[in-house]
Amino acid sequence: MGKQPVKLKAVVYAISPFQQKIMPGLWKDLPGKIHHKVSENWISATLLLGPLVGTYSYVQHFLEKEKLEHRY
């Protein structure tokens, strides 16, 4: 005789809708965490955003100059 398959019960993980503290550490001291990240990485952010803002402003100025040039 062959083996009979055994039915296994599935394990279901769920969060109770009445549970209020799901991730309490995520929102704790949020301004302090943001300040720490910004003060830690300000040089990288400047080096990233500086050329982007410069290029964008140059393109906007160039387009405005082109518009005025073809006005008359």
Curated annotation (Swiss-Prot):
Protein topology in the membrane: Single-pass membrane protein
Protein name: Cytochrome b-c1 complex subunit 8
GO biological process terms on file: mitochondrial electron transport, ubiquinol to cytochrome c
Record lineage: Eukaryota, Viridiplantae, Streptophyta, Embryophyta, Tracheophyta
Role of this protein: Component of the ubiquinol-cytochrome c oxidoreductase, a multisubunit transmembrane complex that is part of the mitochondrial electron transport chain which drives oxidative phosphorylation.
Keyword Transit peptide: no
Residue spans, topological domain Mitochondrial intermembrane: 60-72
Mitochondrial matrix domain ranges by topology: 2-41
Subcellular location, record wording: Mitochondrion inner membrane
Cellular compartments per GO CC: mitochondrial inner membrane; respiratory chain complex III
Subunit and partners: Component of the ubiquinol-cytochrome c oxidoreductase (cytochrome b-c1 complex, complex III, CIII), a multisubunit enzyme composed of 3 respiratory subunits cytochrome b, cytochrome c1 and Rieske protein, 2 core protein subunits, and additional low-molecular weight protein subunits. The complex exists as an obligatory dimer and forms supercomplexes (SCs) in the inner mitochondrial membrane with cytochrome c oxidase (complex IV, CIV).
Family: Belongs to the UQCRQ/QCR8 family.
Transmembrane annotation, as ranges: 42-59
Keywords of the record: Electron transport, Membrane, Mitochondrion, Mitochondrion inner membrane, Respiratory chain, Transmembrane, Transmembrane helix, Transport
Entry superkingdom: Eukaryota
Gene3D superfamilies: Cytochrome b-c1 complex subunit 8 (1.20.5.210)
